[in-house]
Design a protein with these regions (language model features):
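A short acidic, amphipathic alpha-helical/loop segment
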Residues: 24-29, 284-288
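Zinc-dependent deaminase catalytic domain
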Residues: 1, 75-79, 84, 97-352
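Small-molecule kinase domains that catalyze NTP-dependent phosphoryl transfer to phosphate-bearing small molecules
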Residues: 51-109
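Conserved phosphate-donor/acceptor-positioning beta-strand/loop module used by diverse small-molecule
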Residues: 15-17, 26-53
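Short, well-ordered beta-strand core segments
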Residues: 35, 92-94, 297
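Short beta-strand/loop segments at the ligand-binding rim of alpha/beta enzyme cores
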Residues: 7-12, 30-35, 265-274
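Short beta->alpha connector loops
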Residues: 16-20, 280-283
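ATP-dependent small-molecule kinase phosphotransfer cores
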Residues: 1-11, 17
Length: 352
């Protein structure tokens, strides 16, 4: 419609998408759609909102809660604002520090970079940060976790890749995505299900309650037909004692897995190196990164715990936390892959 009215090219910006399913609709509907996240350090963002919009600390906390994706209500999982998830699935990540209130030069430079690539894919090559993070993004697809897929890469100080990792169970064990409640209750397979899962009555009762509930729903709507009824061991175990203990996860974290590959297959040392992660390190992985003398941690999605305040920002050899900026996933290929080799393009332009 805009093209017809203006009789010209149309470049459209939608401000602002805060629901991940809205974003996925546009991603699936329009091939040229790019979901862009603009990130700023939490302390900069708070000061900016207080100064520009005159928000109080309580008002900012309320906004954070609304945008967290955790508010309750009918169909809330599908209709809630969830900025954290939107950042996770973004195609392009921009960094907008607000240490100087009126200085937007860093943001402007990044916008110019990606607009140029949208109009002319392959005009310039990706940055080293983008190149390595794209590998981490690819690695996360190997994860068999049914909650969240995370990828990680460890490099030396020159961004030469030394190891990769993703969140998954130890080698030789069956990932959660390939296990099921049916198998747990009926099969007693010692390869797929642990001795605890096969013999602890409290755990099995809780798991069976979940399976019965699913079967009751399926009798009415057949909604689960064709689905593997995977389950999260941690969720069921924690529900027994009403504790949110992260120790009970079956999977290694992606960062932890990448560190272990260095030991498993040998390494010349990683002191002063870098950790790239599609999430950000938890408290346990942050300690491991610190002990390995990782110099920089490049992350996409800030971890909600106290890893930064309690583990990383202390001592005299603290790793530097860097928010990722760049294109990733499909956008990486769409923006950096030349449609026509530049040499051929120039030759064709001469002939026009």
């Amino acid at each position: 419609m805009i093209r017809k009215v203006t009789k010209n090219k149309a470049y459209i910006v939608i401000d602002a998408i805060r629901n991940p399913y809205e974003a996925k609709f546009f991603k699936d509907r329009y091939a040229a759609f790019h979901l862009v996240s603009i990130n700023a350090p939490a302390e900069h963002r708070s000061k900016y909102m207080q100064k520009l919009h005159k928000f109080s600390s309580d008002q900012i906390d309320t906004i954070e809660k609304i945008e967290s994706g955790k508010t309750e209500g009918e169909f809330s999982a599908f209709t809630n604002q969830n900025v954290k998830k939107c950042i996770e699935i973004s195609d392009i990540h921009l960094f907008n520090p607000k240490s100087e209130f009126n200085n937007n030069n860093i943001l402007k430079a990044q916008i110019a970079w990606y607009i140029a690539l949208m109009q002319h894919p392959g005009l310039i090559p990706p940055s080293s940060m983008e190149r390595v993070m794209q590998v981490a993004y690819t690695m996360k697809m190997n994860s068999g976790c049914i909650s969240r897929q995370v990828g990680a890469v460890v490099t030396d100080s020159h961004n030469s890749i030394k190891s990769v990792g993703w969140n998954d169970v130890a080698k030789g064990q069956v990932p959660c995505s390939m296990r099921s409640l049916n198998g747990l209750i009926e099969e007693f397979n010692p390869v797929s299900y642990s001795n605890y899962e096969r013999n602890n009555q409290a755990f099995r009762i809780k798991a069976n309650e979940k399976l019965i509930k699913i079967k009751e729903v399926n009798l009415k709507s057949q909604i689960f037909e064709g689905h593997n009824l995977s389950y999260c061991f941690k969720d069921i175990h924690n529900s027994l004692d009403d504790k949110g203990n992260q120790v009970h996860t079956r999977a290694l974290h992606a960062e932890e897995n990448a560190f272990l590959q260095l030991t498993k297959y040998g390494s010349s040392g990683i002191e002063g190196g870098k950790l790239y992660t599609t999430a950000s390190p938890c408290e346990l992985c942050a300690k491991k990164a610190y002990q390995l003398s990782i110099a920089e941690i490049i992350f996409i999605d800030p971890y909600p715990g106290i890893a930064q305040e309690h583990i990383i920002n202390i001592g005299n050899n603290a790793p530097k936390l860097i928010q990722f900026r760049g294109a990733i996933g499909k956008a990486y290929h769409r923006l950096y892959e030349q449609i026509i080799p530049i040499k051929d393009e120039l030759e064709h332009m001469i002939d026009l």
